[in-house]
Amino acid sequence: MKFRKINCAVMFLLLSISIQSNANTLPADLSWENNNNAKPWASPLATKGGKFTDFILTFPPTLRTVGPDSNSSFRSYINANQLGLTDFHPNTLEIIPQIATEWAYGQDGKTVFYKLDPSARWSDGNPVTADDFLFTLDFMRSKHINAPWYNNHYTNEITSVKKFGDHTISITGRVAKPKEELHYYYGLVPTPKHFYKKIDKNWVKKYNWKIIPNTGPYQISKIKKGKRITFERKSDWWAADRPLNKNRFNVDKVILKVIRDTNIAYKHFEKGELDSYALVLPEFWHNKAKGKLYDNGYLEKFTFYNNSPRSSSGWFLNTDNSILKEKPVRIALAHALNFDKVIKTVLRGDYERLQAFHTGYGEFSNKNISARKFDLKAANKILDEAGWQQRGGDGVRISNGQRLSLNLVYGRKEHSDRWSILKQDALKAGIEINLRLQDSSSHYKTIMQKQHQIASLGWSTGFRPAFWQHFHSENAHKPQTNNITNLDNKNIDKDIEAYRAETDSNKRVKLANALAQQIHDSAVFIPSFKVPYTRGAHWRWLKFPDAPGTKTSSTLYSPFGDGGIFWVDSKTKIETKAARKNSTKYSSVNKTFDQYRENTSD
């Protein structure tokens, strides 16, 4: 055997690099926590097996979770199977372990130390190590991923990730924060360093349809483009025996079919081709979810009241538009929209009016803010004073030859009736609203390219109110950012930056409330509705714990994330299909669960 000679200087350099990579020393005074006694929310009666079939309205434009076109609704399925260091208990909001088994806090108030589970594995069998978390920082800072928000956050908000051996790390943020916020804002998910060979200018295109290794209970196993995506449960998942994971993630397969029309999807559900169907929309709950399938007990209905931050749902006004850049027009438009009429008629009184962009965040929500009420007299006065006195033969106002005509883009056909009512009343104030229904993919692209005038949508919620991504001028006037109103206000910028940097909880609350007032005053967002519950129907072979959801459940039928608590009873499935053929009846089921119902409205 031949041995290659190594220069002594090279040997010293290699040794030096090895020592430096593990040279960090843990502080001696750390107090480690684990919260292993957190209460499970699954049922010991749950059984494994079977498949769960659901639908999505559009096929995802990419499997990437960062970069162009990645911010689609499908991303939530992928992210839910990528564990972070810790998570929040869905009922108590206390910190619970995931990849980290223990954590401790640095004296600086902005550093958290984590001990990683040595048994953690990627779906391809490779171990999850400290290097994967260090790589996350490099990955998210790379310009090649074409993701400005991530570039900014991981560059300016997370200042360092340090390694103390293969299974211990620390994360330090830019400023000190309360302990629970350190985990949320500075927490990381690992990125498989062994999988990404090179992050270069071709990364976006190269990884558009790559199935990335993950750490969660399921992995994508089959893709039929434009038709369906299948996830399979890992039979040897490394975290399956964790106390909080037992009796969860029970079905063997999760199949997501692409069905581009909700009415057609409901027909698939009634045929037994889908296992559940969300019935939040009043039209479906009151008009469709009835008949023999329900009367005979084959389909069961659940209403579950939750208590969590509410989606920022409403109309977003693009201030780069020549008409909507005028603040009086924006305020007048808000007064010309009769949302209460929509709630009473189309929505059957089921929904409530959302009052502000951030609601349900406790003291971080400004409860003194109310959405502008429908008031045609006020709308007309404002527009007259703003120079829009003249009207055409059709009643639409005109100023300097320009009609007060605006396009509303929206992505759900089921919303057409509600917007038609608003359109009719707005015309009484001389405002023409043209309804532009788009498929989900086109709707998303239009908004991300800032090509809309008015966009109807709802943003997902977070742990605390988020202002920077939605309202800071850094994200205005350019595509692929979440400031879709293009709000550009230096005073608001200043307070957003102060809010992000503030370490005192009381001061942060005051800043959050002040920012909420400024955003309301800017009139770039018109709140629409909030829904204080989730509800749906399912075939009786889907079984649930006594509480079919958690305090923060947005749906009862989530197979991933903090869900996965239902299971398929194969015996009941066979029995139900036979009963349907021979007309055997069961007791009808229409249950309401209100243990987490809000005592007072926001």
Where in the sequence are the language-model features?
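Detector for C-terminal structural segments
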Residues: 35-37, 56, 77, 224-229, ...
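Surface-exposed binding/hinge segments that line
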Residues: 115, 150-198, 217-224
